[in-house]
Amino acid sequence: MDLAPSLETELIDPDEAEILASFRALPTEDDLPCDDGEPMETPRHREQMNLLIDSLKVHWADRTGYYVGGNMFVHYDPENKRRSRGPDFFLVLNVVDRERKSWVAWQEGMRFPDVIIELPSDTTRAVDKGEKKGLYEGLFRMAEYYLYDPWSQEFIGYHLHGMRYHEVERDAERKIYSTATGLYLGIREGWLRWLTVEGAVVPTPLELAEQAGQRATQAEQQAEQEKHRAEQAEQRAEQAEQLVAMYRRRFGDLGGGREQEQ
């Protein structure tokens, strides 16, 4: 009979073992709701959310160790599974790459989002600017919090300095730099977009496909133009040969005639 203590018994004292057992008994994403089942306020809100998520994934196609989601629950209180928030967009850095039904902080080593973007509406604006801001600042200790109203285009950003959020002043082009992503956030054609440091809009997969199609069309048009120019040059050469032949038939070898005259 093996009476040797287990590795866990050797390394963990009784109090820690009790805490660990309690932690293991906590609900996981499989036990918790992933969202509230309510659709986003308007189709424009959903399209705005998808723009932010899809374009960042494209920009970071070769990057690993992050999670980006939207309109799904972030569970933050292990003692009360009903305490959760459903940010319209959130980003967590330096985490395991995998799909998730919801973000469960205690299942992720008490990791909270690094960036949240809320898309206020008439019914959520007060909560987004008040209660949620206080939660993200005080409990999440989240570095960057942004609010963008897809209809009024009101855009506000907060960065955490010390223990408090400070509103970020937009630059001359009315954009804000996100340290977490290395990108800017700015309004382009009525939408909040990720921008490179050079000012280019980070495209979505659809926009990338459209750009590729435009490049292919331009290349095809250029090839057709070059073919047309080549055909025109060939026609001019043929016309020149025909003109020379006509002169020779009418006047003979002009060069030979000049030699005889000399």
Task: State each model region's role.
Residues 67-69, 146-149:
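A structural signal for short, well-ordered beta-strand segments and their strand-loop junctions
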Residues 41, 45, 49:
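Nuclease catalytic cores
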Residues 62-74:
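A short acidic/basic microdomain associated with nuclease active sites
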Residues 1-41, 55-58, 74-87, 92-140, ...:
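C-terminal interaction segment
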Residues 48, 64-66, 87-88, 113:
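A generic secondary-structure signal marking the coil-to-beta-strand transition
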